[in-house]
């Protein structure tokens, strides 16, 4: 392209990031460099910024001075948006508003009046400085009034928000009065969520403290009641049988689910016909194998054993019921033996304190311990019966009447 073709006019829209000036439309040519554009802006821009203090940004890219506009700007765009950023060494002066002019006029009139009446009244330096500060900050107060204005209903509902943030700027200061601080949530909703969160946290903390205090109190009570049981009178002890009956009649341990409810066992429900067919088919296969590959007597023995196991699981033959019924008397005897042993220990301690202990008590204790030792046959029979009865599966627990 020849030199004459380079003289193509282009329109730039200069935007200031501080929004002190409106968007300025600048006409230039594509063969201009960035440095030449800065020189042109120093002459035509309202703040007259220096060339060395200007920074031009286009499409998020900082433009160096040696590049030409034809290499930077997009050809398909009619208008090109360029951001002008000035360094802090020579910040652009803010435009003078009408309020500033009025304030300066008021200051001039007050100064003239003070000079006219200087012979009668002489104002103090503090009053002059106060008037100057008030006059200079008039425009600033006029500009920042819409930002500091808040909703009167919100300020009435939440006065502590205004009082607690007098010296601190919060995000809602620069928002118009009709626009909420957070568009999606109102302050009342956020305050309610914070209150609910604090309440839930406090409830969990109280539950944890209560559980810890209950466990420590129960352990301390158990430790305090244990020495009292050793020093009680034998005749005043209540019978232990009701305690055992209450434990047997107590609710069973229910297995809980992960979601909080009890675990539902599928075997507790009624079986359908498909389950029964599957069970009978397995039994038929087992019996057919035993019948065809064994003798008739073994087949009868296997059938009888299976029937016995089934009746035991159904609750017809509870093998361990006798032991369960004798458990309470055995516990009573064990408690009585423990009480007798405690009484013997107390008696021995009293005899040792009195100095009346002799060797006859030791011989009698050895004879009693030797008489209580089971024999060899009794131990063997107990081992065999316990081993074979443990092979039989336990039936459902018996319901106490």
Swiss-Prot record:
Membrane topology: Single-pass membrane protein
Domain of life: Eukaryota
GO cellular component: membrane
Disordered: annotated span: 87-137
Primary location recorded for the protein, binned into one broad class: membrane
Record keyword Cell membrane present: no
SUPFAM superfamilies: Ubiquitin-like
GO biological process terms held by the UniProt record: endoplasmic reticulum unfolded protein response; spermatogenesis
Keywords: Membrane, Transmembrane, Transmembrane helix, Unfolded protein response
Domain Ubiquitin-like: 10-89
Entry annotated with the keyword Transmembrane: yes
Cellular localisation: Membrane
Bias (Low complexity) ranges: 88-98, 109-126
Alphabetical list of Pfam families matching this protein: ubiquitin
N-terminal signal peptide: none
Transmembrane spans: 299-319
InterPro entries: HERPUD1/2, Ubiquitin-like_dom, Ubiquitin-like_domsf
Function comment: Could be involved in the unfolded protein response (UPR) pathway.
Protein name in UniProt: Homocysteine-responsive endoplasmic reticulum-resident ubiquitin-like domain member 2 protein
Source species of the chain: Rattus norvegicus
Taxonomic lineage of the native organism: Eukaryota, Metazoa, Chordata, Craniata, Vertebrata
